[in-house]
Design a protein with these regions (language model features):
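Short, small/polar-rich loop/turn modules that mediate ligand/substrate recognition or access, typified
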Residues: 127-132, 188-190
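Catalytic Tyr-x(3-8)-Lys segment
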Residues: 152-172
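Short C-terminal tail/terminal secondary-structure segment
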Residues: 178, 189-203
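Hydrophobic positions on the long internal alpha-helix
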Residues: 71-79, 83, 118-119, 176, ...
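Canonical Rossmann dinucleotide-binding motif of NAD(H)/NADP(H)-dependent dehydrogenases/reductases
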Residues: 1-29
Length: 203
């Protein structure tokens, strides 16, 4: 019987869904009674556009950061029981800017850091139910237009990625997410992984 995954978001979420499709029945909206894996990457287009914070109206900020963060929190309430039914895993995908900062991406960085901390909090509170929670920080190319991502990567790196390339969302990142949902990864709790080929190496 195939495992069931819920993938929330577009863009990078679509590519992760494609990478997991051979091993999971993939849902894109909540509703299943049991879930082995939930992946969240629901970043609105407004957050992924370069904008000075002073150019964002209160309504813009709500749309780019506060509302999607609240939606992520609400999603966790919805998926708790389905994940508990299988002792499943929830993974939040986070842009590099949440850790390293990014000029003109304050909303995106704030939203990313919000869900990263949410993952840690869930790991502490849901562990007793057998649910594991993690975040994975990805290269800006996973979230931004190519030219914008290249600029952010250059601003935050002292070297080219040791891997020699940016990891592919479907072929490289999706298998890591699949591993996080495996029994072998069960002792790893509340991790904040960085999967960018070695571009950003936090201490």
């Amino acid at each position: 019987m195939a495992r069931r995954a819920l993938i929330v978001g577009t863009g990078v979420a679509d590519r992760i869904a494609a990478g997991l499709a051979d091993d999971y029945d993939v849902d894109r909206t909540p509703g299943a009674e049991s879930l082995d894996l939930v992946v969240w990457a629901d970043y609105p287009a407004l957050a992924c556009e370069p904008r000075q914070i002073t150019d964002l109206s209160p309504a813009d900020w709500d749309a780019a950061c506060d509302t999607p963060l609240r939606s992520a929190i609400d999603l966790t309430r919805t998926v708790h029981a389905p994940l508990a039914a299988t002792r499943g895993t929830i993974v939040f995908l986070v842009p590099l800017m949440a850790s390293a900062g990014g000029a003109e991406y304050t909303a995106l960085a704030s939203l990313g850091e919000g869900v990263r901390i949410l993952a840690k909090s869930l790991a502490k509170t849901w562990g007793a139910a057998g649910i594991t929670a993690h975040s994975i920080t990805l290269d800006p190319h996973a979230f931004l237009a190519a030219d914008d991502a290249a600029g952010i990567a250059a601003d935050n790196a002292l070297h080219d990625p040791p891997l020699g390339r940016v990891p592919d969302d479907r072929d490289d990142v999706a298998p890591i997410i699949d591993w996080l949902a495996s029994p072998a990864a069960a002792p790893l709790v509340g991790s904040s992984l960085v999967v960018d080929g070695g571009l950003w190496m936090p201490g």
